Swiss-Prot record, chain A:
It is found in: Cytoplasm. Consists of a catalytic RNA component and at least 4-5 protein subunits. InterPro entries: RNase_P/MRP_Rpp29_sf (IPR036980), RNP1 (IPR023538), Rof/RNase_P-like (IPR023534), Rpp29/RNP1 (IPR002730). One of its GO terms (cellular component) is ribonuclease P complex. Disulfide bonds: none annotated. GO terms for biological process: tRNA 5'-leader removal. Pfam families: RNase_P-MRP_p29 (PF01868). This is Ribonuclease P protein component 1. Part of ribonuclease P, a protein complex that generates mature tRNA molecules by cleaving their 5'-ends. Belongs to the eukaryotic/archaeal RNase P protein component 1 family. Residues 73-93 are annotated as: Disordered. GO terms for molecular function: ribonuclease P activity; RNA binding.
UniProtKB/Swiss-Prot annotation, chain B:
GO terms for molecular function: ribonuclease P activity; zinc ion binding. Keywords: Cytoplasm, Endonuclease, Hydrolase, Metal-binding, Nuclease, tRNA processing, Zinc. Belongs to the eukaryotic/archaeal RNase P protein component 4 family. It is found in: Cytoplasm. InterPro entries: RNP4, Rpr2/Snm1/Rpp21. This is Ribonuclease P protein component 4. Binds 1 zinc ion per subunit. The gene is rnp4.
Amino acid sequence: MTTITPESLPRHELLGLHARVAADTDQSRVGIAGRVVDETMQTVVLRTASGVAQVPKKGATFEFRLTDEAAAPDNGVGTAFKPAGGETRQTTGESVAYVTVDGGRLLSRPERRSENGVDSKWR
Amino acid sequence: MASIAAERIDRLHTLARAAARTGDDDRAREYVRLARRLAERNRLTLPPAFRRFTCDDCDAVLVPGRNARVRTRSGHVVVTCDCGTHARYPYTG
């Protein structure tokens, strides 16, 4: 039901999505990948395999992975009930899309991002 | 067609419950606060399940038996958060 399209992504919820730093003015940050666990006005916090990394939005280019149920937790309670060898959501190839976004477009408080580019009704 | 803000609240609700389930209470709180802020700015009503199972005072995701006590009194249910805040909900019958 919940749908994030590549067009709406900069205004949509980033928390819970999988992201990778595709390019950055600081080379040491390129390649950081993980689940977005927190967001501030100027940074995105990724939970990587080796810990938590806080990446400034400015100067970075992020590659977000969109799946049909990106909001579902990777280690949700349902995991234990999946039959052995059954399908996981990662194997359904056509439902996965990668969206590349310039970090500069995300520079906004998390709760204000949804309102960017929308004319206010109260004027 | 739900607005982006409504979809974000929906996702945050799922994320907050998932974080609370894995014991990441402070993360869950932040998700609840962000969802509340979105509802406030976009003049949306939060889902009933969200309103009932989050603490008004400390924004915790309430899990009965773990960080919330649920007791029935005459005519109302009392949900007590670990922080001490009570919430009362009437019932009939």
